[in-house]
């Protein structure tokens, strides 16, 4: 008599009252009955940063069928430098020390070969590195 639950009150449905699915299982099966035995939890978080992939062109199609293509450098580029292995000091308040954003001035259909040979963002990383070095000294 003790193995079965008591009957429900008058007027209640009996469809949800049943014996638990964990009855008769081993103690190790009570903790993870739905997971396969080959499943291993990762003990630590990943230590390498995730880098977003940037496409070299942006293609948009309007409802009437017109195709617009914006090539490099006519769209905004965001990039991050690799973080240091050990941080000596935290960044300044309200300053993100590793993220830079370069926004173009206009749309250029042709890509100049001199643009690809030069660093298009010369002051971005050196500015943040000078801030960090001046604070850590």
UniProtKB/Swiss-Prot annotation:
Protein's cellular compartments: Plastid, Chloroplast
Source taxon at top rank: Eukaryota
Keyword Isomerase: no
Predominant location: plastid
This protein's UniProt keywords: Chloroplast, Plastid
One GO cellular component, as annotated: plastid
Family stated for the protein in its record: Belongs to the ycf72 family.
Stated name of the protein: Uncharacterized protein ycf72
Native species: Oryza sativa subsp. indica (Rice)
């Amino acid at each position: 008599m003790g193995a079965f639950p008591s009957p429900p009150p008058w007027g209640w449905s009996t469809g949800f009252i049943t014996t638990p699915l964990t009855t008769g299982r081993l103690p190790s099966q009570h903790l993870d009955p739905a997971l396969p035995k080959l499943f291993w939890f990762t003990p630590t978080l990943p230590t390498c940063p995730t880098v977003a992939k940037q496409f070299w062109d942006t293609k948009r199609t309007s409802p009437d069928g017109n195709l617009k293509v914006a090539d490099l450098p006519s769209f905004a580029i965001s990039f991050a430098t690799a973080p240091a292995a050990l941080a000596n000091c935290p960044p300044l308040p309200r300053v993100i020390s590793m993220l830079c954003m370069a926004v173009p001035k206009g749309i250029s259909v042709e890509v100049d070969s001199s643009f690809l040979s030069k660093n298009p963002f010369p002051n971005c990383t050196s500015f943040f590195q000078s801030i960090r070095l001046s604070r850590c000294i």
